[in-house]
Amino acid sequence: MKNTNLKKCFTASLLGIITLGGYAQVNYVEPPIMGWSSWNTYRININEELIKKQADAMISQGLDKVGYHFINIDDGFFGFRDEKGILHTHPQRFPNGMKGIADYIHSLGLKAGIYSEAGANTCGSLWDGDKNGIGVGLYGFEHQDANLFFNEWGFDFIKIDYCGAGQQLDLEEQERYTEIVNAIREVCPRNISLNICRWAYPGTWVSSLARSWRISGDINPSWESVKYIIDKNLYLSAFAGNGHYNDMDMLEIGRGLKPEEEETHFGMWCIMSSPLLIGCNLTAIPASSLQLLKNKELIALNQDPLGLQAYVVQHEHRGYVLVKDIEEKRGTVRAVALYNPTEETCSFRVPLSVLELEGTTRIRDLVKQKDERSVTDFIQFDVLPHGTKILRVEGERRMEPTRYEAEQAYLNQFDDLGKRKRGIAFMPFETASGGMTITNLGGHKDNYAQWNEVFSEQGGTYQMTVQYIPAEKKEREISDRRLEVTVNGNMTVADKLETDRSKGVAQTTFTVNLQKGYNVIRIGSRFSWSPDLDCFTLTPVK
């Protein structure tokens, strides 16, 4: 392949390599994909006519008009590999082959997605007894299948699963997915949207390979499943952005959830910038579910040109307040979620200062699509069990932030695979400022927490107070605990730290210099462990 083709392929993926590890401003990023996928309702029981009917329904239901453009064919289309290793589709389910179905989808003005497996055998072969899924994965056929999927058949998206690669071959995730993506880049003349499906956040390497990645096990149409996935994604906002997204899995709208649960499901997927892939039968979707899926004001949060994921700023009474900028970075308009995962009504009282806003503030309920009364001090709502208020909030002025939570940081060596004996992780702690800390920080120069957008209106000298949790006495390294705090490359070391955990949250204070605008602050310890980190605050020195 010529280099010109390689440059065209995966340009969106390459965009985020630098910016996720260090600050950079962008004016526009490619938003999460929107469409329909076959797996939730049909699993491997798909065929050519079924896919065409769903594509037709996408148009007839008007979903394409609000942004749903992908028709993704998941597991179940495989037939076999012949003696030359060439992949064939299922002769009964797809008698006219996959190029014909991709062409049909394209003829409707839509985009076509396909599925494969990083190993040899598909998830359908393991979990659904599909013998046609044996030996049809990408393992050993990376270049050949990539050419078939994208150049011969013409697909625009691929989801790459990990059942055969992980459960059978025990391959290492980063190495295996890098091998596959490199093969696609070598043969692909187009920008393919790629999804990595490892059922847990796989590591910070993923943003250089994929546009989206799964962060949890498969969804199902139950409140417990929706709640579980939201919980998994609450503290992953720093790992999304610049056209790369945490995938909360396909939507279960229209598959039996209660109305308030559907509103929470769709609203949280939107404000957290997950891909929006409908998973129900579009020819039989309830009217209320269809109306929700076509809510342009919620969709606008998901497709916002900033491409940000909402993050937690307040946690009380077991409810969560999440916020993100929309329309303009550090502007006066923000999206807010008041999320109640509990079995009781939750009363939210959110000071405007928590949202970094002040002055008369206008509020719009995006689910109900109606304006609420303006406020000048705090936002207050009662939210029913399993419910969520999704709000557009517009203040008069934007305030300079003073508190940065540990759980909002980019953790350079974080993953959720559970393979590391002592990997950096999120750890609940009741008296922490947000009820959450990060643990197993430090011990290596690369095992740090970093805040890439610490903002100062004017710059100057600040008092920085770091709150932390003293180590347990049983931990042998307790006397060696230290914090190395680097501000725009300038390091301050705090090594005389509290060692009595019974005293609760401790703190250490020093002065730092911030530049006007955005600053990068990194906390860790190169040669010893750091204590569990709660947050830090910044106060200008007058």
Residue ranges and their predicted role:
Residues 277-342, 420-442:
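Glycan-recognition and catalytic regions of carbohydrate-active enzymes
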Residues 50, 54, 58-167:
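Aromatic-lined carbohydrate-binding/catalytic grooves of carbohydrate-active enzymes
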Residues 267-313, 385-412:
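Catalytic cores of secreted or luminal carbohydrate-active enzymes
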Residues 346, 355-363, 377-380, 386-542:
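Extracytoplasmic
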Residues 1-25:
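Bacterial Sec-dependent N-terminal signal peptides
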Residues 141, 175, 187, 191-281, ...:
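Glycan-recognition surfaces
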Residues 269-272, 277-279, 316-357, 386, ...:
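Carbohydrate-binding surface patches
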Residues 28, 32-38, 67-74, 111-116, ...:
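Structural recognition of the beta-strand scaffold that forms the well-ordered cores
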